Curated annotation (Swiss-Prot):
Binds 2 Zn(2+) ions. This is Ribonuclease Z. PANTHER family: ZINC PHOSPHODIESTERASE ELAC PROTEIN 1 (PTHR46018:SF2). Zinc phosphodiesterase, which displays some tRNA 3'-processing endonuclease activity. Probably involved in tRNA maturation, by removing a 3'-trailer from precursor tRNA. InterPro entries: RibonucZ/Hydroxyglut_hydro, RNase_Z/BN, tRNase_Z_dom. Zn(2+) 2 binds at D64, H65, D209, H269. The keyword DNA damage does not apply.
Length: 314
């Protein structure tokens, strides 16, 4: 699994930060969280393949989070895309996509499936054998949702028990791995007889734009979140501005991360007012005095975060 931060800015882009967009690569598939203006150009500087984007998750319909969609849709059409593209977002997302497709001359020959998500209740919006995706309602100036991507880990085979029961590599072992009972020498063997509990999988939360919500932190804790990407539009001294605009400060984001039980928090959606990050770094240092175990990172454009927890400069 690898995260690529395509854009880490806020409402107004800067020389150093593009509008919000984050790619999550998992099992050869790309999941895109928000798609701000210039996203497709940012992708050029990474190893993200636009043709492998199957799902786009929109947190809310402010322009800085969605204005990259028209260009991306057209570009992947030019590249010959035929497989469906799924777009998830809060209420009015379908209307927005319809308006996009009705402006200009688009030749899009692949299916676009739009799924509107409630901004009032949490939902499991995707469920597969390998991963689940959840939405959670957050509080912003327009309907908004956060997302959680959770890897599904299957039970591991206990080779000692397998050997003890005399199960050989073959159809019986495969059936047990797939969750079915088998009969061996007149005895029924269940998957539970030969498996160990699954290891903890990777679970990534993305806040979108929001005020700090303890309810969101508790939801993340329930899902055993390991990495939280949380907006931190302002530093601690701008708390009044954060409250007025329904955003979060660095301290807000760090407190939510600590409450959620996440190992790592990555701060993003940095206001254009910050040419440098000394105020952010000061807030992080102060917080870590009392919470040294929390791994804190401030995202930068075109930075990657790998499964092994390492930053990679593109």
């Amino acid at each position: 699994m690898k995260l690529t931060f395509l854009g880490t800015g806020a409402a107004i882009p800067t020389k150093y930060r593009a509008h919000p967009s984050i790619s999550l690569k998992f099992d050869g598939e790309i999941f895109l969280f928000d798609c701000g203006e210039n996203t497709q150009r940012q992708i050029i500087f990474t190893d993200v393949s636009p043709m492998k984007i199957n799902n786009i998750f929109i947190s809310h319909l402010h322009g800085d989070h969605v204005l990259g969609i028209p260009g991306l849709l057209q570009s992947i059409a030019f590249q010959g895309r035929t497989k469906p593209l799924n777009i998830y977002g809060p209420e009015e997302t379908a209307k927005m996509i319809k308006n996009i497709l009705n402006v200009g001359y688009h030749s899009i020959d692949y299916p676009i499936n739009v799924y509107e998500i409630s901004s009032k209740t949490s939902e499991k919006i995707i469920s597969t054998d390998n991963y689940d995706v959840f939405s959670f309602p957050v509080v912003h100036s327009v309907p908004a949702v956060a997302y959680v991507f959770r890897q599904v880990k299957k039970p591991r085979m206990d080779l000692e028990k397998v050997n003890k029961l005399g199960i050989e590599i073959g159809p019986d072992l495969k059936r047990l791995k797939d969750g079915y009972n088998v009969e061996l020498n007149g005895k029924i063997i269940t998957p539970e007889d030969v498996t160990l509990p699954p290891k903890k999988g990777i679970c990534v939360g993305y806040s979108g734009d929001t005020i700090p919500l303890n309810e969101f932190a508790d939801f993340l804790k329930e899902l055993k979140c390991t990495i939280l990407i949380h907006e931190a539009t302002f530093d601690k001294t701008m708390d009044k501005n954060a409250k007025e605009t329904l955003h979060s400060t660095v301290h807000d984001a760090l407190n939510i991360a600590k409450r959620s039980g996440a190992n790592t928090v990555i701060l993003t959606h940095i206001s254009a007012r910050y040419d440098e990050l000394s105020a952010f770094e000061k807030d992080v240092v102060e917080f870590k005095v009392e919470h040294p175990d929390l791994h804190v990172l401030i995202a930068e454009d075109l930075m990657e975060y790998s499964l092994k927890g390492k930053w990679v400069k593109m």
